[in-house]
Amino acid sequence: MAGPARFPLTFEDVAIYFSEQEWQHLEAWQKELYKQVMRTNYETLISLDNGLPKPELISWIELGRELFGSWGEKKKPDKETHCSIDDVHVHLAIEEQLLESSQRAVKSEVTCHSQLNPLESRHSFGLAVGERVDASLRHDQGISLVNAQTRCGEAVVSVVHSSSEAAQRKVLSSHRTLALPGLQRVSSWQSTQNSCPVCRENSWEKNHLVKQQKGHSKSRSYRVWKKFSRQADAKQPWSISCLGCGKSFRLKQYLVRHLDIHTRKRPPQCPKCKMCFHHERTLFSHHLKNSSSQHPTCDTSFRTDSSVDLCQQIQERPAFWREDTNVPSRQKPGPSLDCEDCCHMGSKLKGLQCGCILGEDRPHSHTEYGNCFLSQSKQAGLCRTHTGEKASQCPESNKRLCLRGLQNVHQHGLRGEKPVFCRKCGQGFTKHCGLTEHTRILSGEKSFWCAQCGRNFSQKGQLLRHQRLHLEEKPFQCTMCELRFHLKSRLRAHQLQHGGERPFSCSECGRAFTHQCKLREHLRVHSGERPFQCPECHKSFRLKGVLKAHQRIHSKERPFSCGECGKGFIRQSKLTEHFRVHSGERPFQCPECDRRFRLKGQLLSHQRLHTGERPFQCPECGKSYRVKADMKAHQLLHGGQMPFSCQCGKGFAKQSKLVEHMRTHTGEKPFQCPKCDKSFRLKAQLLSHQGLHTGERPFHCPECDKNFREKGHMLRHQRIHRPERPFACGDCGKGFIYKSKLAEHIRVHTKACQVPREPDIKKRLSQLFAMIEADWS
């Protein structure tokens, strides 16, 4: 396989020259950097061939002479160096930046009459649409790099990979004496425009050029042109190789980095911060970032000189550029800047103060806030923001809006249109900001961070609402009772106590809600939909908050703990209910009997005693219950399940029954009578005992008007009115109301006359006293 093509390489091929006018526009540090780059390029050529004579430019640099003059007319050195262009360490990136800064004020008006076919030049001269011209073309006098970029595209070093490479370079050298193809005579202010390489249309700002090129990417002509460019690039082999190790590279900049390994030169270092860099162009960019230029009139500092020139251009631009409305916005030479005081920033130069740029050139100013604007419409827009004036009105809903641009978004919401769609899930949105928040939720990104507690949020509004907790800020106040709240939703929920409106009502049960999202959650009760499923136990829930609280059961996380007893809870609401145990607060009162309860569920269950409602019915036996938990415990009996078991082997369907049973083993009697100091194991026993002191008999038989202190006594009594005899004898079939009566009857068949024990006597006496008490009542 043949190696890379070799041809005579001289210092003129890697050098760049300035005219006297261009040299004067360079700053001192840029001149020193240029001299250093030229010396480095010369040392690279010397390392390849020691017999190379010293050029006149290097001699002037070493003697410290002023560098300007007609450098285009130089003698060619007598000796030529035959080497591969791929092995030369050339710093062209820094030279390009020097050219851009020096030729910012010097604009050429030379017209090139040479016409080259772009497709032909691609294969013949190594150039194509969108590439730069060879760096050696730039030393010709009178050719501006800005104009070259405007008509001929960007610039890179071009290496020809054909056998007739030397002949092609001669054709290029003959073309240097003319100018670049396609260069036209333009005025000085038009030379700062950016040109699209596809349609040749000019624009003032680069972001407009980028948007324009994105539009071309959809056209068929652009796709054909780009496909040809890629095919031509693929045909060129990687012939840029290192002579030391033979490694090949696609771009020259990769070879430049690789040559530093062989030469082991000392890396360039910044004289101020002593920071080292791999390449001098990186050091040059570091100089630009650290060195700040200052505007001479407004004393505002900038990082680059282009910002200073742009500031000067805005101050000195003619009046018709500010007032003429016929010029399209993307072709106006100056960027739009707004006031910094009220946070209305423009697209560029956000560090400029209003007094610097706006000064006398902006005739329209806001009287209250002091903001200055280029046109009267901008001033009127800010005035409407502060005064609350609505400029436009929707023809469909008659709603008035501050800005005309909001009218389209508002009409999309009325029609149900969602022009912005998510590519992953297909969900639609009326605004782009809604899509942005949606993508953060899908990706799990939480870019908003609280500096005090370290909690992350996916939306900025969530962070602002969270920070009110740290600041103890309550901006929302009730107009009736003057209570303040952190969130607006809490205020709306509070206002319902004063008779607030509930505009969203359920069509099935008629229940009304303040928010539409609450109505959606309620509709899942009727439809039975449970969209949130636990990934561990596969249990489904109607609400996402309930799912999160359920997942804490698996993780054993208890983020909400009581400050008095240290008990932890998985939900904030459970902690709030627990606080009432310590404080003794009972905020829920029954309107009929004035009894108070700690929980709202307890009040609802109690009210069913007055109404007789039993909404929870067992699907197997049809038995109804007032409380849902009692129905679930009853269903466990049908399945033979006893999830709560004692150490003695006895099982229970409810945990409360297990707790009551454990007191039989421990002997604990937590319920004490305040009058006689007698203690009881169950609360029901205490209530029954207190009836002896008060004489109260709350349980009433509806058939015979008898009253009882205990519910069990009433149920035993009601068996008298029923024809059923649930306890039947197996021998004779006689039925009995009570089980004790059946036991006495069985002794007749067995003829067993046992001596009653003392516990049986006490039991008989208690039954006797209960019957006597029922008869006396």
Curated annotation (Swiss-Prot):
The keyword Methyltransferase does not apply. Coiled coil: none annotated. It is found in: Nucleus. Pfam families: KRAB, zf-C2H2. SMART domains: KRAB, ZnF_C2H2. Keywords: DNA-binding, Metal-binding, Nucleus, Repeat, Transcription, Transcription regulation, Zinc, Zinc-finger. One of its GO terms (molecular function) is zinc ion binding. It comes from the Eukaryota. The keyword Transmembrane does not apply. InterPro entries: C2H2-ZF_domain-containing, KRAB, KRAB_dom_sf, Znf_C2H2_sf, Znf_C2H2_type. GO terms for cellular component: nucleus. GO terms for biological process: regulation of DNA-templated transcription. Its main location: nucleus. Residues 9-80 form the KRAB domain. A zinc finger (C2H2-type) spans 194-216, 240-262, 268-291, 420-442, 448-470, 476-498, 504-526, 532-554, 560-582, 588-610, 616-638, 644-665, 671-693, 699-721, 727-749. Belongs to the krueppel C2H2-type zinc-finger protein family. May be involved in transcriptional regulation. This is Zinc finger protein 786.
